[in-house]
């Protein structure tokens, strides 16, 4: 056979043959390095899908129920949403393996709707992180941490004080309601507006009156965004729908455009009034950071001016909805468990007193309150799933094959209710996070609670959210006692959306004495 081929290729020397063989081997080794073989593994199990629509028909709002098929199929479940394969991950160790040990295999998915969030420049939703931060390690430094770390302590204290100020409004409102014709009121509205005001102060350096139309417009816009995103967008999974009339998608695009216009206006104002020696808020801090890096060509962290708008927008959205939802659930749990409410008040009375407002430095002295917050996060799991991820390459996890571009959902609800992690997970019990004598917080147990994701793509607003929830809740428990309205049952059934919220309701609040 070789002799038959030789006339076709001509005479070949031994050295040329060796060079050719070495070249072929090097190319083969390079291809193996760039495209390593994924160990042969079966696809993840899952329910039978229908053509085109997949498994969407079996879920409310087009989203998988957080407590659904996992018990039947295990920690790795494959489903079909429209025409796209989706893997749902459950189990603490499985999720830890995926997000931390194999975190480089995942990124935000290239979903159609994501390009309209922050004009495609969102830190949380963009598939291209290179334009925000250059190297992978620096790529996930939280801008809020940057704000704190750069020495802008006066501005930080100002906004911590703002949380105290806004937290104190609800007790005053309760006092007004108590002397009115109707002793009940909707605490959710006051919580949302107060939280929005603190976030505005931290991000934009401005605060509003609670009836200010610009503030209320922002609150309503954020509420609309949550409802639209929570209802799902099938155009992300059935491409044909992108070319058909879609009222939900039009509404989604309009909401994002209004957000961008608002933030762009504020960022422009900040550039015009920027003073390097007077950093007022996170926007100023990011501008300062951007200006410094422009002068340093060798900097590890690079950020364009236009990215500032997207980052500030992300921080506002992440901090606002998470905090307001956490606080509203907290009030509901206080009403549902009056004995815990009294226990929390007694701890604050003993450790902080009633003559001043609690501050962040009180946290280490209030382990019962910290445990209560952990249990709120765990039991309500109001963020049942993280922001979707996507496989960057063919990979395998726990013996199952996950093809490149597979969308990956992380089931936080299951982790927070896993009977292998938690004793009686359906029971609300803050003591699970305390030492036997309730004098210390069990930090190891707290680390198992999953609400803000895990690994390099943790929620960028986590630090802001935790601090605000602590301050607001400490002030409310110190100054108020919450009660259900007689004759009206307390309905804590969650309503699914971007975050799971309880049904709006009226409660009663009594102002506590300062003695």
From Swiss-Prot:
Its EC number is 1.14.14.1. It catalyses: an organic molecule + reduced [NADPH--hemoprotein reductase] + O2 = an alcohol + oxidized [NADPH--hemoprotein reductase] + H2O + H(+). Substrate binds at residue 225. Its main location: endoplasmic reticulum. It is a peripheral membrane protein. One of its GO terms (molecular function) is iron ion binding. One of its GO terms (biological process) is progesterone metabolic process. It is found in: Endoplasmic reticulum membrane; Microsome membrane. Keywords: Endoplasmic reticulum, Heme, Iron, Membrane, Metal-binding, Microsome, Monooxygenase, Oxidoreductase. Its cofactor is heme. Induction: By benzo[a]pyrene (B[A]P) and beta-naphthoflavone (beta-NF). The keyword Metal-binding applies. Heme binds at residue 459. One of its GO terms (cellular component) is endoplasmic reticulum membrane. It is an enzyme of class 1 (oxidoreductase). Belongs to the cytochrome P450 family. Cytochromes P450 are a group of heme-thiolate monooxygenases. They oxidize a variety of structurally unrelated compounds, including steroids, fatty acids, and xenobiotics. PANTHER family: CYTOCHROME P450 1A, STEROID 17-ALPHA-HYDROXYLASE/17,20 LYASE. This is Cytochrome P450 1A1. It comes from Microgadus tomcod (Atlantic tomcod). The lineage of its organism: Eukaryota, Metazoa, Chordata, Craniata, Vertebrata.
């Amino acid at each position: 056979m070789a002799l038959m081929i030789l006339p076709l290729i001509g005479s070949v020397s031994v050295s040329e043959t060796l060079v050719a063989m070495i070249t072929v081997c090097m190319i083969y080794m390079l291809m193996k390095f760039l495209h390593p073989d994924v160990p042969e593994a079966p696809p993840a199990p899952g329910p039978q899908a229908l053509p085109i629509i997949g498994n969407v028909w079996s879920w409310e709002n087009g989203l998988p129920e957080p407590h659904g098929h996992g018990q039947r199929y295990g920690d790795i479940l494959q489903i079909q949403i429209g025409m796209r394969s989706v893997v749902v991950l459950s189990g603490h160790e499985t999720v830890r393996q995926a997000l931390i040990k194999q975190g480089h295999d995942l990124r935000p998915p290239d979903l159609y709707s994501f390009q309209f969030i922050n004009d495609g420049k969102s830190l949380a939703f963009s598939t291209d992180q290179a334009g925000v931060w250059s190297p992978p390690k620096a790529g996930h430094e939280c801008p809020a941490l940057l704000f704190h770390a750069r020495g802008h302590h006066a501005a930080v204290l100002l906004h911590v004080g703002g949380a105290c100020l806004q937290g104190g409004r609800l007790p005053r409102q309760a006092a007004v309601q108590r002397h009115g014709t109707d002793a009940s009121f909707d605490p959710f509205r006051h919580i949302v507006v107060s939280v929005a005001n603190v976030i505005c102060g931290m991000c934009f350096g401005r605060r509003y009156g609670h009836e200010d139309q610009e503030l209320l417009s922002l609150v309503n816009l954020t509420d609309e965004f949550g409802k639209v995103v929570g209802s799902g967008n099938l155009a992300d999974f059935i491409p044909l729908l992108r070319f058909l009339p879609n009222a939900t998608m039009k509404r989604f695009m309009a909401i994002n455009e209004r957000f961008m216009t608002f933030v762009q206006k504020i960022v422009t104002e900040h550039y015009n009034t920027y003073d390097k020696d007077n950093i007022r808020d996170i926007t100023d801090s990011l501008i300062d950071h951007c200006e410094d890096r422009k002068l340093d060509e060798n900097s590890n962290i690079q950020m364009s001016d236009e990215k500032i708008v997207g980052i500030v927008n992300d921080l506002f959205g992440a901090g606002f909805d998470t905090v307001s939802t956490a606080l509203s659930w907290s009030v509901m749990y206080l009403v549902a468990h009056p004995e815990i409410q009294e226990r929390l008040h007694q701890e604050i009375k003993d450790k902080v007193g009633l003559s001043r407002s609690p501050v962040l430095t009180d946290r280490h002295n209030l382990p019962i309150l910290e445990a209560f917050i952990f249990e709120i996060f765990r039991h309500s799991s109001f963020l049942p799933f993280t922001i979707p991820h996507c496989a960057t390459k063919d990979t395998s996890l726990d013996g199952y094959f996950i093809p490149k571009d597979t969308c990956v959902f992380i089931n936080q609800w299951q982790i927070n209710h896993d009977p292998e992690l938690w004793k009686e997970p359906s029971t609300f019990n803050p003591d699970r996070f305390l030492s036997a004598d309730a004098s210390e917080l069990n930090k190891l147990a707290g680390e198992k609670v999953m609400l803000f994701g895990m690994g390099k793509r943790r929620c960028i607003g986590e630090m802001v959210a935790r601090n605000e929830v602590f301050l607001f809740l400490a002030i409310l428990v110190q100054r108020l006692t919450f009660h259900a309205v007689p004759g009206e049952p307390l309905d804590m059934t969650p309503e699914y959306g971007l975050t799971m919220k309880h049904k709006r309701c009226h409660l009663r609040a009594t102002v506590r004495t300062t003695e």
